[in-house]
């Protein structure tokens, strides 16, 4: 049962419909402290209609409200505070979580509508750095959240698999590379060749000319050039997939930049037909002055198309292919202007579906407030960070529980999960500092702390033995359980909020609050005591385990049963 709706209904009856249930729902608040009740309604929203002081309205409402199902309803100043019947509430919430299991919190907001999500998008022949983490894990969590409320997410890894760098790479490979080296370690060796090309071309400018020729061959469909390009792409993708597997992420499409090579002419033709292309200093632009934006540069003076032309082709292709209800681009906030231009050009082309395109921006990962990189300025590789996190997790497991079965598997889940959780607990628009020792701690507001809380709940259930929970005996009178019960009830609303704000941090913060409340309850209660409420207490533990596990799943984090 949605208790907020119940509160709104009794208020609506008490004010004889002078305020709609929808308006009442929008005004109902959750008091910050439990002594002020579970819900509060500010009576001053009625003072204009009723021409009375808010305090008087609050007192009169308390007299009129049907208090059935509430422990009490009282006026405190201009507020009407509602205290829920704790036994009824615990019975309702626990039976709902127990019966629905991992489906608890599922909703039908999306009606099965398609939502392509452009995310991750590393460059071929370059390693995935920590810079790729945010787009990858935010995009994945949004996909899981959208799926929970019945959208159909389509995860697209828009690979950086085209550009003049491939001419350089082909030249470098032919001069200094070998098939064996590429197969043994594709990314690092391809990067090594590329770096050497730039070192050598300082004294050999003819290398640049050769690279341009090879890229021209690639554009013209030369068999050897295409074969090498495809091979570099495949070998790189194999390596990326190893990282994605560790993050438990799969994609529905790997269509990258190259896929749209034959789709850009249509865009320039359409812009021409609609009279939107204008010449400016030899280049072709779309004027976006009415949107307070700089002109969108469509084609350079040498006839080469640009990044935005490719993105226009991708947007049109995705609309035609998926008939999307929303289309998301999980890309850093430095690209905000680019996406404003993209939407404005599509709008000028007459495509109203451009309103359903959303840029999901995010901040940087920093170290000591500066952009994350090693002392030498080298990028920090994502795979190395995951390895280091797993080692730290392993060390802590050895200290806390050396006899744990499947230690390596649990350390992988905890280490990788810690890195993902730390990213997602931060509001995505904010930049945040990354310190691995802080991230992989089992205490504080961390992923391992939430995982450990789930494992603790599972341990209690194992100690209870093969207990068949009685769904008719779920009343808890213990006030220590109240905060945990209230948080369990808030899970569906949390999911809804995270989806509407495209904000996984809402779920991560919720998981931390639920874990804290449960651990406090655990410290104060004898859960396995044989008394009339033992069944209800174990039902609460089961419900916490289910909800913590599902919260972590929505973030792309595993929940080990033992730690």
From Swiss-Prot:
Coiled coil spans: none
Keyword Aminoacyl-tRNA synthetase on entry: yes
Ranges spanned by the short sequence motif 'HIGH' region, renumbered to the chain: 122-132
One annotated Gene Ontology cellular component of this protein: cytoplasm
Domain of life: Bacteria
Keyword Oxidoreductase: no
Family per similarity comment: Belongs to the class-I aminoacyl-tRNA synthetase family.
UniProt keyword list: Aminoacyl-tRNA synthetase, ATP-binding, Cytoplasm, Ligase, Nucleotide-binding, Protein biosynthesis
One annotated GO molecular function: arginine-tRNA ligase activity
Name the UniProt record assigns to this protein: Arginine--tRNA ligase
Subunit structure: Monomer.
Catalyzed reactions: tRNA(Arg) + L-arginine + ATP = L-arginyl-tRNA(Arg) + AMP + diphosphate
Cell location: Cytoplasm
Its EC number(s): 6.1.1.19
SMART domains to which the protein is assigned, alphabetical: Arg_tRNA_synt_N (SM01016), DALR_1 (SM00836)
Pfam families membership: Arg_tRNA_synt_N, DALR_1, tRNA-synt_1d
